[in-house]
């Protein structure tokens, strides 16, 4: 949070978990800045119980409109890498080595080239689903919170999906409401 960042800058705190996104460039190369591999995977969750997310081609189109390398390298300023499996770097296997080095014979579970941003293919998939240029699709709502990279990623999704004709409304929700909302399926 910005409050924690300010406290760190003033010397009140010795360490903070995250630097505000806009401050990362000023921290790179500093002795007191270190990026630790995150044990987790950043992903977009779609509610498959709601239309149009129950249509495979719509989900594929939304996926192909996302440039994962851009998200990881630019929006997240190199603090993430585009995922090749649901378990990202940092997970340790039983022998102490990195999980990804052993899992699936050391090969990625996913061929990321299949998931490379492809706006034309995404548009075709939407058309195949009955939504040429996004026509007929209702406005979609993406719920997120405003911590860390979430807001920046949500704004990117809004822009990326607009390129294929999808109108996305970004809804910022407090963590205290966000988690129960997700558990109850009250999201798109």
Give the role of each language-model region.
Residues 81-128, 146-151:
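Structural transition elements
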Residues 1-50, 69, 73-74:
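Extracellular/periplasmic solute-recognition and catalytic clefts
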Residues 39-41, 82, 137:
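Extracytoplasmic
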């Amino acid at each position: 949070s910005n409050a924690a960042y300010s406290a760190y800058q003033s010397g009140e705190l010795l360490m903070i978990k995250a630097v505000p996104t806009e401050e990362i460039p000023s921290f790179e190369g500093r002795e007191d800045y270190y990026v630790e591999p995150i044990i987790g995977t950043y992903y977009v969750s779609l509610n498959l119980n709601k239309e149009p997310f129950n249509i495979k081609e719509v989900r594929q189109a939304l996926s192909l409109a996302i440039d994962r390398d851009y998200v990881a390298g630019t929006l997240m300023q190199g603090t993430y890498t585009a995922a090749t499996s649901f378990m990202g770097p940092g997970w340790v296997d039983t022998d102490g080595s990195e999980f990804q080095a052993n899992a699936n014979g050391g090969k990625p579970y996913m061929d990321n080239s299949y998931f490379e941003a492809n706006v034309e293919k995404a548009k075709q998939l939407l058309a195949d689903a009955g939504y040429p240029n996004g026509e007929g699709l209702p406005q979609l709502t993406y719920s997120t919170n405003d911590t860390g990279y979430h807001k920046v990623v949500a704004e990117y999704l809004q822009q990326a999906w607009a390129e294929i004709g999808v109108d996305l409304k970004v809804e910022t929700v407090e963590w205290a409401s966000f988690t129960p909302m997700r558990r109850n399926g009250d999201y798109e």
